[in-house]
A protein has these predicted regions:
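A short, surface-exposed alpha-helical micro-motif characterized by mixed small hydrophobic
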Residues: 214-216
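ABC ATPase NBD coupling module
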Residues: 18-20, 74-90, 108, 116, ...
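Conserved ABC ATPase signature
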Residues: 148-152, 156
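Conserved ABC transporter NBD signature motif
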Residues: 65-73
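ABC ATPase "signature
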Residues: 232-233
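The feature captures the beta-strand-to-loop junction immediately N-terminal to the Walker
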Residues: 42-44
Length: 356
């Protein structure tokens, strides 16, 4: 059964520039969400990801197209109907800190849910419901109840907000960049929580710019560019056999940090710079960052396998071989293969992005 359906949704914003023209944020976006699945909505900044989340949460009105929930157009909801809609469709956002008033205890967000949706529930029953919801997000109620926001970690705050959604009998969770402000270990906890909730029948829209996170958590993936869907399908298929050039470009930029660099047999050295083939002997091979405009190494995955850094090097790259001789610069396309004797492992601090 389809829980939520987006059908040919477009959204135009009026530009603030002189002339006040219309700027498209979404272009005929269509997809369906069903119970018990995670859909990753992936794209660069400005691709329209957050706009889709706002449309689903009735925070933005589509210029054209419809969004239906259990067969009913959400634009038709008002009053009690809209209140019921928000009971079943909830959002959790990038910055958990902004959802709390620092002068009140963090669990006050549950009091607001109670007064709006469960005013007749007694104190004891409500406390049991709150503790059950907090347990469901892998937190100990004794560790978080009664605490102020500044006394909780970002991960605890985010999970408390997910627990608030669970109190409402939520069916669809819009998770907009919810782990981008969390540290690495906490990210895994929240991702695993989403997988657990999916198993309990929750439909989750996981909005992210990070393909590796989407690959980890989702059943289906939507790739968005300039407000339009360029590719959509099973996550394994999208990541394993991408069809659109934009998807391929995004995937080549993903660092595979789980892969350890080893002295495994590789093909013989073959370097082509500006169309000229050139063989390199068994010398030192390095990958360095470069601030030179246009310098780029086509096979950036080599850097990803050589470094254990958690951050992607933001500068363009160039290949430098024996004696510091650059074989790639400008707009040249380079294919690189290295023999094991030519490989040397460097500590992460040898591969550091230049200061911005």
């Amino acid at each position: 059964m389809t829980t939520l359906k987006v059908d040919q949704v477009s959204k135009l914003y009026r530009s603030s520039a002189r002339g006040g023209g219309l700027t498209p944020a979404l272009r005929k976006v269509s997809f369906e969400m069903k119970p018990g699945e995670v859909i990753s909505l992936i794209g660069e900044s400005g691709s329209g990801k957050t706009t889709i989340g706002k449309v689903l949460l009735r925070l933005a009105k589509p210029t054209s197209g419809t969004v239906t929930f259990d067969g009913k157009d959400i634009a038709s909801y008002s009053g009690r109907g809209l209140k019921d809609y928000y009971r079943h469709v909830q959002g959790v956002f990038q910055d958990p800190f902004s959802s709390y008033n620092p002068i009140y205890r963090a669990d006050r967000v549950y009091d607001l849910v109670r007064s709006s949706y469960f005013p007749k529930v007694g104190d004891r029953e409500w406390s049991e419901k709150v503790e059950a919801a907090i347990d469901a997000v892998a937190l100990n109620p004794a560790d978080v109840l009664g605490k102020y926001p500044h006394q909780l970690s970002g991960g605890q705050q985010q999970r408390l907000l997910i627990a608030r959604a669970l109190l409402l009998d939520v069916k669809v969770l819009v998770a907009d960049e919810i782990i981008s402000m969390l540290d690495a270990s906490t990210r895994v906890d929240v991702l695993n929580l989403l997988v657990k909730l999916k198993g309990q029948g929750l439909a989750i829209l996981f909005i992210t710019h990070d393909l590796s996170l989407g690959n980890y958590v989702s059943d289906r993936t939507i790739i968005l560019r300039h407000g339009a869907i360029v590719e959509m399908g099973a996550t394994g298929k999208i990541f394993g056999n991408p069809q659109h050039d934009y998807t391929k470009m995004l995937l080549t930029a993903v660092p595979e940090l789980h892969k350890k660099w080893q002295h495994a047999p590789l093909a013989p050295v073959a370097v082509s710079a500006n169309g000229a083939g050139e063989g390199l002997g068994a010398g030192t091979a390095e990958l360095l960052t470069s601030s030179a405009p246009g310098s780029r190494l086509a096979q950036a995955s080599i850097l990803e396998e050589l470094t254990h850094a958690e951050q992607v090097v933001k500068r363009d790259l160039r290949a430098v071989f024996g004696g510091g001789r650059a074989v790639a610069s400008g707009k040249s396309q380079v294919a690189v293969a290295l023999e094991p004797p030519a490989l040397h492992e460097f500590e992460p601090d040898h591969l550091v992005a230049e200061p911005e």
